[in-house]
Amino acid sequence: MKRNILTAFAATSLIFSSTQAFALINFSAGIPFSHSFSGNWYDGSAVESDGVSGMFIQVGVPIFPGVGMDSYKTKLKDSTAELATTIYNLYYLLPIPVINLTLGVGAGSTELQCAACSSAFEKGSATQWYASFGMPIIPLFDLHLSYRSVSSKIKEKSGTNEHDLSGNVMGLGIGFNF
């Protein structure tokens, strides 16, 4: 009987000491490492990424939704243009012991940036949903992998052609809990 009680106490201590329920505030920062496009240019040709750089940040408190911002630029393959995306997020860190699962939605803008882009393309809107899976490395820090599904369309100023620049962004980050 004593052994069962001690085992249950030890297991409970390990599980609950690594949850984020004890934290007063959480802060997370990450970087995108992959951006793949599912949309096409208006003529049907594929949009391809040649690398992505930027950041993701988010701040929250337990039980309540948190806020965040994504800001990144994606270099387009065989082009001098970059796709600049800025999205503001609302997320919720699910209270699951041992792992940190975050679900969120966001809205913002996207635009093509190059020498002639501002005169040729309008600024487009962007929306996303995302999920982040984190594993605590020590009780107040975690490493997380995120997946973002972004919907984005940009119109040409000279006509009705609309480019679908939707896609998926993968990121890697670290979370701190105070």
Model-found features: residue ranges?
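Short N-terminal segments immediately surrounding and downstream of signal-peptide cleavage
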Residues: 23-38
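Gram-negative (and chloroplast) outer-membrane scaffold detector with strong preference
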Residues: 31, 35, 54-143, 167-178
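Short, isolated positions in well-ordered beta-strands
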Residues: 27, 46-48, 101, 143, ...
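Outer-membrane beta-barrel domain signature
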Residues: 40-50, 77-81, 116-122, 156-163
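Hydrophobic secondary-structure block in the mid-to-C-terminal portion of proteins
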Residues: 147-178
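Solvent-exposed, flexible loop/coil residues
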Residues: 5, 37, 41
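Cleavable N-terminal export/targeting peptides
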Residues: 1-26
